[in-house]
Design a protein with these regions (language model features):
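S-adenosyl-L-methionine-dependent methyltransferase catalytic core, i.e., the SAM/SAH-binding region
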Residues: 1-321
């Protein structure tokens, strides 16, 4: 079988249907004269719709960020002629990007944390377990690959990654099988890894689980791209640069992301920080924000029918005080 290899990139090929688009636009409560940040441009679906609602003559402006060079190229093409600036940078450095453009505060910000359809569908990027390709998984296309990780880390560290980032119940068994396999030859492709993962699963689990590699691939992708660390730092720096009354909208796609965002939002929207055993508040704290959504917004039946990748999307919205 031939491996998928990466060809010259065409922005027109970057297909990504923006998830919960109308809900995000409503959540941002866009001021045509405001400054907005999209920290995860992807296919620029959300970015374009935000930019279309801004009035450049009144100072309206969008800053759109992404670490993926393909996404940046796509965003620049699709935002051409609109009041938008596209910067190639990881969201954890959003504050630096804003400051470099002379921007202190934004009136709203959006993060869509899903892997784009383009990244999943382009087998050569190594995110998918359905086609054979180099085991890559790098969003930025720089640094350590998933192949580097599975061929060098100890069984203990691999098991930790699979357990912590993939919530994989068979983490120890899969890690052991990876170590055994690489002693014979390096693990270099996605289907090699998928076969190894399947072989580590009990037969009953293989029969029950149509995609036994899903959790392992998620865990490795998160580890390779340091996604949770980047998300935590990105949330903090974006909140620091959010103007009073500004909205922060975050779309998550798995429980690890959602838990992190939920806890951040709860902390910012809680006034008292005293230990729970204190009978009365003594800290005199004030909430830094208020929750616009008490529970996450999910895709409606029409969107679920039109875009199956929206089924795990959860949108949370916060307003800074």
């Amino acid at each position: 079988m031939e491996l998928e290899t990466q060809a010259a990139f065409d922005p027109a090929s970057f297909e990504h249907i923006p998830v919960l688009l109308n809900e995000c636009l409503e959540g941002l409560s866009i001021d045509p004269a405001g400054t907005y940040l999209d920290g995860t441009a992807g296919g620029a679906g959300h970015s374009r719709q935000i930019a279309l609602r801004l009035d450049a003559e009144k100072g309206g402006r969008l800053i759109s960020l992404d670490q993926d060079p393909d996404a940046v190229q796509t965003a620049r093409a699709r935002l051409a002629g609109l009041p938008a600036t596209v910067v190639q940078i990881n969201v954890r450095y959003a504050g630096q990007a804003l400051e470099s453009l002379g921007i202190d505060k934004v009136n709203g910000a959006l993060l869509d944390l899903g892997v784009s359809s383009h990244q999943l569908d382009d087998a050569a990027r190594g995110f998918s377990y359905r086609a054979d390709a180099p085991l890559d998984m790098r969003m930025s296309q720089q640094g350590e690959t998933a192949a580097d990780l599975v061929n060098t880390e100890s069984r203990e560290e691999l098991a930790r990654i699979l357990r912590d980032y993939g919530e994989e119940p068979f983490a120890w068994q899969i890690a052991g099988r990876i170590v055994e396999a690489r002693e014979n030859s390096p693990i270099e492709t996605t289907l090699q890894l998928a076969d190894i993962v399947a072989s580590a699963m009990p037969p009953a689990e293989r029969r029950k689980n149509k995609n036994p590699s899903r959790r392992t691939f998620q865990a490795l992708r998160i580890a390779v791209n340091h996604e949770l660390d980047a998300l935590e730092e990105g949330l903090d720096t974006i909140f620091d640069h959010l103007a009073p009354g500004g909205r922060l909208c975050v779309i998550t796609f798995h429980s690890l992301e959602d838990r992190l965002v939920k806890n951040k939002f709860r902390r910012w929207s809680t006034a008292c920080t005293c230990p729970p055993e204190f009978p009365v508040c003594v800290c005199g704290g004030k909430a830094k924000a208020k929750l616009i959504t008490r529970k996450p917004i999910e895709a409606n039946s029409q969107e679920l029918e039109e875009n199956r990748r929206s089924r795990s999307a959860h949108l949370r919205v916060l307003e800074k005080c």
